UniProtKB/Swiss-Prot annotation:
Tissues and organs where the protein is expressed, per its UniProt entry: Present on all retinal ganglion cells (RGCS) and their axons (in embryo). Absent from mature axons along most of their length, but is present on new and growing axons derived from the RGCS at the retinal margin. Remains on adult RGCS only at cell-cell contact sites and is continuously found in the retinal axon terminal arbor layers of the adult tectum.
Region feature (Disordered): 529-555
Biological role stated in the UniProt entry: Cell adhesion molecule that mediates both heterotypic cell-cell contacts via its interaction with CD6, as well as homotypic cell-cell contacts. Promotes T-cell activation and proliferation via its interactions with CD6. Contributes to the formation and maturation of the immunological synapse via its interactions with CD6. Mediates homotypic interactions with cells that express ALCAM. Mediates attachment of dendritic cells onto endothelial cells via homotypic interaction. Inhibits endothelial cell migration and promotes endothelial tube formation via homotypic interactions.
Record's comment describing the protein's domains: The CD6 binding site is located in the N-terminal Ig-like domain.
GO process terms (BP): adaptive immune response; cell adhesion
Taxon lineage: Eukaryota, Metazoa, Chordata, Craniata, Vertebrata
Protein name (record): CD166 antigen homolog
Length: 555
């Protein structure tokens, strides 16, 4: 009896009160459960009798989905179409639609009936789906410089609403200008799911600079974020504008080496066959861009060219220089000369460039070659001449030997440091090295020989006065010289006599110096009296003495 009363109250409320007319919107995800709130999920009214969900069918007529009595736990599903197995009601009276699809994009109405009121809340459902990642397909194999070509097609699938596609080059958006860039977009819908696929075709006029450009396609959708395709690069075809010839062999090029010439063109794809002009002779090479000269000589120096097979005017030129160095030295090897003779050294050189010449003597660098017009013993040695240009060096040499008859230049004596011995020194010049013979026995202290100069020393203890001779010999001749050597006693007496003589000579020199000074003084004094005309004061005897002294001859 109570439920009947409630039902009658509901009908009265439905007749008295007008339902609300405001329509809200809810976004559902494709394939997910769509939640449609009733009155934005607010608290249920007091005296609730039941809640009913209904919808607008495709033909515009209303259709019932379910009713939930306030006193019952379960709702009664009244739908007979596809919603029968997909709809349910939540505890807050929200409508739950399982496995949402684009067919659910319609208006759903929640009717709330209580003892005091009847309200209807309409909600429009929209179903969104994020598109698949964008993919560039049907790519062009290559692009031609200056020619409008379809670069590729960008595709995204299964989206709602449809995605927008944007083409970019090096992250810069490409804009359709109707001439050099043309972008054509189309949208297709799946007949079953209703989902949209978007495709965009790009026609692009490439330039040479695009050889390293990267093209991408960006998909923009309300579900965000933006999705970007994998970057694509394309070979750019363009004709040759410049030919270049390179000498790839290591510089400098020397006689006997191989020289490789390489011809390159800036076209793409690059030409693979060329004409080489080898000093006026045309040589065609196919399927390669190099030509090799084997075992070059100085005669191969000259102008070389290369050009395209179909265009001889477009060519490149290189001058090839083969480096060479010819050197002749006179004399070479071992050279034997006598001291005082003349030696003429001549160096002849022929080179592809200015040659640098350096001389060394016995491994020591010389500023210049010595003057050999009058050879000395010090001129002997190994002379090496290095002549070089870049990459080439020649070394020639001669070993000069200067010979001469021995000649003694000095024979001296002095006491040893302890004063008990006499040291005789005999110095001589000659080559080969002279041998020495002394006329007395003694101790040979040292022998040195350098640059044709020999030094011999002999230590003796003479017991009497001696005459010592030094004899030097080599294969060319000999020389001898003598020196007197006194015993220690005689030498001491001689030294004392020398001291006495020195003292006497010193006294005589001092006396002469005093007399000279006195004479100069008297002479100056007399000249002073004549000049003044005055008579000197004094006796007549003093005047006579002065007069006599003036007439005496100087001693």
């Amino acid at each position: 009896m109570q439920s009947v009363v409630c039902l009658i109250g509901a009908f009265i409320a439905a007749a008295v009160f007008r339902p609300g007319s405001c329509v809200g919107t809810v976004i559902g995800l494709y394939g997910e459960t769509i939640v449609v709130p009733c009155n934005d999920g607010t608290k249920k009214p007091d005296g609730l009798i039941f809640t009913k969900w209904k919808y607008v069918k495709d033909d515009g007529s209303p259709g019932d989905l379910l009713v939930k009595q306030a006193q019952k736990d379960e709702a009664t599903v009244s739908a007979t179409d596809g919603y029968k197995s997909r709809v349910s009601i939540a505890a807050n009276s929200s409508l739950l639609i399982a496995r949402g699809s684009l067919a659910d994009q319609r208006v759903f109405t929640c009717m709330v009936v209580s003892f005091t009121n009847l309200e209807e809340y309409s909600v429009e459902v929209k179903v969104h789906k994020k598109p698949s990642a964008p993919v560039i397909k049907n790519n062009a194999k290559e692009l031609e410089n200056g020619k409008l070509t379809q670069l590729g097609e960008c595709v995204v699938e299964n989206a709602n609403p449809p995605a927008d596609l944007i083409w970019k080059k090096n992250n810069q958006t490409l804009v359709d200008d109707g001439k050099t860039i043309i972008i054509t977009s189309t949208i297709t819908k799946d007949k079953i799911t209703g989902l949209s696929s978007t495709s965009s075709r790009l026609q692009y006029t490439a330039r040479k600079e695009d050889v390293e450009s990267q093209f991408t396609c960006t998909a923009k959708h309300v579900m965000g974020p933006d999705q970007v395709s994998e970057p694509e690069s394309f070979p750019i075809h363009y004709p040759t504008e410049k030919v270049s010839l390179q000498v790839v062999s290591q510089s400098p090029i020397r006689e006997g080496e191989d020289v490789t010439l390489k011809c390159q063109a800036d076209g793409n794809p690059p030409p693979t066959s060329f004409n080489f002009n080898i000093k006026g002779k045309k040589v065609t090479v196919t399927d390669k861009d190099v030509y090799t000269l084997t075992g070059v000589t100085r005669a191969d120096s000259g102008i070389y060219k290369c050009s395209l097979l179909d265009n001889d005017v477009m060519e490149s030129t290189q001058f090839v220089t083969v480096s060479f160095l010819d050197v002749s030295l006179t004399p070479t090897g071992k050279v034997l000369k006598n001291v005082g003779e003349n030696l003429i050294v001549s160096l002849d050189k022929n080179a592809s460039s200015e040659a640098k010449v350096t001389w060394t003597k016995d491994n020591r660098k010389l500023d210049k070659l010595p003057d050999f017009s009058k050879l000395t013993y010090s001129d002997a040695g190994l002379y090496v001449c290095d002549v070089s240009i870049e990459g080439i060096k020649r070394s020639l040499s001669f070993e000069l030997t200067v010979e001469g008859i021995p000649k003694i230049t000095s024979l001296t004596k002095h006491r040893s440091s302890d004063g008990k011995h006499k040291v005789l020194t005999c110095e001589a010049e000659g080559s080969p090295k002279p041998d020495v013979q002394w006329s007395v026995n003694g101790t040979n202290d040292e022998v040195s020989y350098n640059n044709g100069k020999a030094t011999y020393k002999l230590t003796v203890v003479p017991s009497k006065n001696l005459t010592v001779s030094c004899l030097v010999t080599n294969k060319l001749g000999e020389d001898t010289k003598e020196i007197s050597v006194f015993s220690q006693k005689n030498e001491d007496g001689t030294e004392q006599a020398k001291v006495i003589v020195g003292i006497v000579v010193g006294l005589l020199v001092a006396a002469a110096l005093v007399g000279l000074i006195y004479w100069i003084y008297i002479k100056k004094t007399r000249q002073g009296s004549w000049k003044t005309g005055e008579k000197e004061a004094g006796t007549s005897e003093e005047s006579k003495k002065l007069e006599e002294n003036n007439h005496k001859p100087d001693v």
